[in-house]
Amino acid sequence: MLRNEKQKLRVLFCHSIRLHYLCNMINYDLKKIKAIVFDVDGVLSMQTVAMDAEGQPLRTVNIKDGYAIQLAQKLGLKIAIITGGHSDSIRKRYEYLGVEDVYMKAAVKTETYAELKKKYSLSDDEIMYMGDDIPDYQLMRLCGCPCCPKDACSDIK
């Protein structure tokens, strides 16, 4: 792994996220992280959703997030998506980026999270989760390193 690439990844993530208060960063070793799990709406896509002529939601994604995800994978991190929503275009986007674990319509995110941990034999301390709203709260309490976008709802910050 190239040192320069690790620095780029750190800058990309630290620029756009706020580490959650549940994660005591003073004593936390980010080197433990083996997987990063993301929510979609409000995290990897904008908080506003346009609708097409058939009433299907149209979401926009940030190209820099895609670059950061690919770089994280290149550095050996497992990337997963756990979202309560469903969008074929979002699924295709992250599959295109090489994300193998894209869980849509996750009614209870903590159950999907437990499946993911079991699949890869991960502990909570080895997982970073980024969420932005109340449905993410319980999962953020479980993972080793919860974080959120700067514009997350105040209850999550």
Where in the sequence are the language-model features?
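Surface-exposed amphipathic alpha-helices with a cationic face
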Residues: 69-74, 114-121, 141
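Acidic, Mg2+-coordinating phosphoryl-transfer loop and its flanking beta/alpha structural elements
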Residues: 128-157
